[in-house]
Amino acid sequence: KWALGIALVAVAGFTSCSDQPDAYETTGGTPSISYIRLADAASKDSLLTGAFQNTPICIVGNNLRSIVAMNFNDRPATLNTSYMTDNTILLTVPKDIPDVVTDKIYMITTSNDTVTYDFKVLINPPSVLSMENEQAKAGEEGVIKGNYFLDYPDFPLTVEFPNNYVLPREYIKSITMTEIRFTVPEDAPAGFIKVKTKYGTTRSNFQFHDQRGILFDFDTPNPVTNVVLGNHGWHAQKIQEDETSLSGKYLLLGDVDMTADGAWNDGNFSFEYWAGDWNGGFSGDGVKLSDIVDFTDFENMSLKFEMCIPENGAWAAAPMQIIFAGPDKVTISTANNVFFHADDGWGRAIYAPWKDSGSYNTGGKWVTVTLALGGDQGVFNKYWDGTAASVKPSKPEDFASLTIFCVNAGGYIGEDCHPIIKIDNIRAVPNK
């Protein structure tokens, strides 16, 4: 019986082999490529001489089952024999950036020969997304963030400021795929920054040392009424200058204990600029912010400011509610603390960088915070309790006044802390 069982297994094994006449087998000889197209059959007439990383392609040729490995430049492609025939190979262009660019495909055969075919792996031009501190001073470290920051010995990456000022190479401290660290030079002009690589040049959407759309820098008279704007509400938060200043005076919120539930403490955590004067107008230090900055295209604008939080003043509770409002909601003469949590569900941004990590500080450095006012990335869409807002700012005059209040009304429970939050250069600027 045992012998019969073994014999039956052996027969079954041979039967299973003979039942797979289409099993993949490699061939000998030399492969050749006739052309390459997109893998999508609907695009079969689109012949390619190059493709971006991670693009599905179809290689058409002869004797392609003689290929056992394939490299694009110096990066291997994944070959799936289920998608390989004598005449076609379906594969995806490798996603990794090549170290050595030759603009060739290398086909390694069953006989360990290498056959080449001219084909470019197209690499995206650099993406320049943000600067850690747009107001970084000369001698300080600047950090540009983005992607595809590719630096080659034969084509070094360059950073260009306005007026054709190219950052000297010796000022660049390090380059990774997503970050450029450099020492800010004394004579770098303010404005848009360009990053150039072998694969293209991209201009930033932000400006270095941006002075557009300033609402509060706590030092400079506004251009409409020639008055320095600051506290203009119920509370007089500290506006001060010291050795930690970014540039002149800054606004200080906190520097007192805050409970984990983010309890109401407007005396220490609420900055109010409520437009208006006591005569029913908007003169002097009560000018409407919407008269200082043009908010007509607010859907394509962002609120920005620089913020500094020391390690010994980490922020771990009470999200920052940033609330714009029109004269119909609040002025200095109609001052109230109801408009921003009334039943109409008025929208605002709720900023809580500590929420996921449990605690947040900037290590005593100044960093730029960017909050989109509108559009797909707009964040001024939350109500007082963190739910979706029913009504959002919809016209320029809705940006006449500004309240910044660190307080929790639901969903933002943190940890007991003693936050020290320094803010400067509050501005509203175009996204591009």
Regions found by a protein language model. Name each.
Residues 13-16:
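C-terminal motif of bacterial Sec signal peptides marking the signal peptidase cleavage site
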Residues 237-284:
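Short carbohydrate-recognition loop motifs
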